[in-house]
Amino acid sequence: MSNLFNKIINDRQFNFQPLEFGHETGYHVDVKDKEGTRWEFRMFQIDDKWKMEGEKLPSWIHDLESVIGKAIDAHE
C-alpha cells in the first residue's frame, strides 16, 4: 500500500493516509474548508468503486467522491 500523500482538488489540499479495515484497505482523508475547519473521512472500495464514509460531511466533499477516488487510483 502507498505511503502518505496529498492532492490539490478544487483549490483545497486533501491529505491521504493508508489504513487497513480488517482484511480490506482504504484511506483516511482530511481537508480544511475555507473557514479552517478540518473535515475527516474514510475512503474504501466496494465493487471496484471508491466510497466515502464520514459523519456530517458538507455537500461539497460528498460531491467530490468520484474525483477523490480517481486521485487515489492515480496515486496507486
Annotated model-derived regions:
Residues M1-G22:
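Negatively charged, low-complexity tracts enriched in Asp/Glu with abundant Ser/Thr
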Residues I9-Q13, D33-K34, K70-E76:
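Short, surface-exposed, charge-dense and proline/glycine-enriched linear segments
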Residues F21-D48:
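A short, structured beta-strand/loop element
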Residues R38-E76:
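Acidic, low-complexity intrinsically disordered segments
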